[in-house]
C-alpha cells in the first residue's frame, strides 16, 4: 500500500531522544541490584497443591485428598517432604514465581538468561534510545581512582558516540548499540517454577565460582521465596560447602599430576576449606573479597555487608518457622 500523509501519525511507545546530550548516572554494581517478587502462589495455594498431589497416589476416593481434613502443621510437613524429594516432587513444578531483577549489568544478564529453565521478558535495547541509561562500577574499581576515572571516561565516550550515530539517522539504534559497554544497566522479568527456582538459588549462591552479583541475586530471591513459603527453609541452605568447587578444584590429571576441572579463581572460603591445596592452585592467591582495588580500604566490602544482612533476614525467617514447627 502507498504512504498516506493524510493519516495521523501513531504515538510511538518509546521516547525519542534525537539531539539530546547523553546523561549518565553511575552506581556501585552490587548496591544497585534489586529483586522484586511480582507474582507467586500464596502459601495456602502451595500447601493445597502439594497435599492434593501427594495424597492422590494411594487415595481410595477423590475426597481423600482434601487438605481441609488435616492440620496446618501437617500440610507444612508434607510440603517439606515435597521440597526435599521425600515425596512426589511434581507439585514444585505447579508453583510459578515471577521476579523483576533490576540494576543488572549486561554481564549479569548473560548469566541469568543462560539458565534455560526460565521464561524472560527484557527491557529493550533495539528500538529504545539508551543514551540516558545508568552504568555501574564494581567496588574494586571505585577503590582504584586511576582506573575509575578511565572507566567513567570510556562509558561517557561510548555513549556520546552512540548518541551521535543515532542522531545521524544514517546508523540505526540496532547497530549503534554495539558500541555500548557491558556495565550499562537493564532489568529483566524472570519466571521459574519452584523446582527450578530452588536449583537456581543453589547454583548461584556459590561464592567460589559465581560472581558476587549472582550470589546476591540468589540470596534476594531466596528471601522473597521464604517470605511466601517458609517451608522452603528446609531446603535452602547458604552455609553448606560449595561441593562442585570442592570436588573440581584439584583432581588427578591421569598423568601423575593434578589439574582443575572447574573454576580456580580464588582460595576457598572458610566453609569450603575442607581439602588440601597448594597456594598456586588458584589464579589469585587470596580469597575473593580480599581483592578490592589498588587503594583497598580494608574492612567489610559492599558485598559482605549486603550478603550478611540478607542472610541474617533469611535466618530470622528460618528460626521463626522452626519455632512454629516445634523445632529448636
Name every feature range the model reports, one short phrase each:
Residues 1-328:
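Family-specific signature for flavin-dependent thymidylate synthase
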